[in-house]
UniProtKB/Swiss-Prot annotation:
Provenance organism: Pinctada maxima
Family annotation (InterPro entries): EGF-like_dom (IPR000742), ZP_dom (IPR001507)
Gene3D superfamilies to which the protein is assigned, alphabetical: Laminin
Protein name: EGF-like domain-containing protein 1
Localization in the cell: Secreted
Cellular-component GO terms for this entry: extracellular region
Stretch forming the signal peptide: 1-19
Length: 348
């Protein structure tokens, strides 16, 4: 029999930014004394980067019902006092940072009401972050999405990290000016990074699908969610994007099929798809890397057709994969003619 399990290979790290508060800048409040050099000086009763909270309001232990992130401190039992670099109910959002999606970097900046400046990538003022609907009360939100492959003046800087082979960093310098069309000593520059690591994070077929950006399933002619089948039977692996609003298509870029002998711990693997192209393999198994439209979600889902095969007797087959996410249907890579026969064209 042929058993299915899965392995996910993409992890998105946080971006790194610098401090971005100067009480002299328009829009920023200071309930203490605003120092010429930018910090807000609190008296003995106040705390916070802007001296906005009385020390007597701080909560600890069982008196606090929320978990504040990024060194935020709990007060009034259910609120978080953030540092100047973070905002949001739980201090979960960077004031200048990024969302690291699988095919792009979405730069984000939160500025106070009264902000009259601009935020843009260092390459050009035309690479501005544009105002969008804010999800933080009392803050204006600016945003700009740059795809990894963007070759315009607003394109990202890309680095292959050494010695961690496989790690890739995309970054940009962000200028924040507090007066329109100007630059001064109270303005800021932040270096924002997204690092993509091939670290493996496991999931099983019965794990809650809602936890992951991809739902992987398998089907044959009789079942739409098969977990066991016979050797040489046709089977299709489906990779459905979910929880990522700007992803409308997915296609397999890399697929490795592997198994581990539970007694000897020996590991064997087969690279089935590389750079989007089916690969020749020692088991003479044919693979086809495709996609198909899911009528239920109107999204293009990754589809790999193959035949079930055994690496180790009585051991499960597992999958290590990397997907390419696209804002619409992914373009099909140009591949050399496969060295083995094409997978069956019968619907499975």
């Amino acid at each position: 029999m042929f058993y299915l399990s899965t392995f996910m290979t993409i992890v998105i790290s946080l971006s790194l930014v610098s401090c971005s508060y100067d009480c002299n800048n328009p829009g920023y409040s200071c309930k203490g004394t605003c120092h010429y050099y930018g910090p807000c000086i609190c008296n003995e009763k106040l705390m916070g980067y802007d001296c906005s909270v009385l020390k007597s309001r701080m909560s600890t232990g069982s008196n606090c019902t929320v978990t504040c992130q990024n060194n935020g401190k709990c007060y009034d039992g259910s609120k978080c006092l953030c540092s100047s670099d973070y905002t949001g109910d739980l201090c979960e959002k960077q004031t200048t940072g990024a969302r690291c999606t699988l095919d792009a970097v979405v730069f984000e900046a939160y500025r106070p009401i009264g902000f009259v400046g601009e935020t843009y990538l260092s390459q050009s003022r035309s690479c501005k972050l544009l105002e969008t609907t804010s999800d933080v009360p009392g803050m204006i939100k600016f945003e700009r999405k740059i795809f990894h492959g963007d070759t315009s003046m607003c394109g990202l800087k890309k680095h292959m990290d050494i010695p961690s082979a496989g790690d890739v960093t995309y970054e940009a310098d962000i200028y924040s000016t507090f007066q329109y069309n100007s630059w001064g000593t109270r303005d800021f520059m932040d270096n924002v990074k997204c690092q993509y690591k091939p670290t493996r994070v496991g999931l099983s077929m019965d794990a809650p699908d809602s936890l992951f950006p991809i739902k992987m399933s398998a089907r044959d002619g009789a079942s739409s969610n098969v977990q066991a089948t016979t050797q040489s039977a046709p089977i299709s692996l489906l990779f459905s994007p979910q929880n990522i609003p700007d992803v409308k298509g997915a296609m397999v870029d890399y697929l490795e099929v592997y198994s581990i002998n539970s007694t000897s711990k020996e590991y064997k693997s087969v690279v089935a798809v590389k750079n989007g192209c089916a690969q020749k393999n020692e088991y003479n198994v044919a693979f086809s890397n495709l996609d198909e439209l899911d009528p239920a979600t109107s999204k293009w889902i990754g589809l790999v057709k193959m035949q079930a095969f055994i690496i180790f007797e009585n051991e499960p087959i597992l999958f290590n994969y990397r997907l390419r996410f696209c804002p619409d249907r992914c373009t099909t890579p140009t591949c050399a003619a496969p060295x083995v026969g094409q997978a069956t064209s019968a619907a499975v």
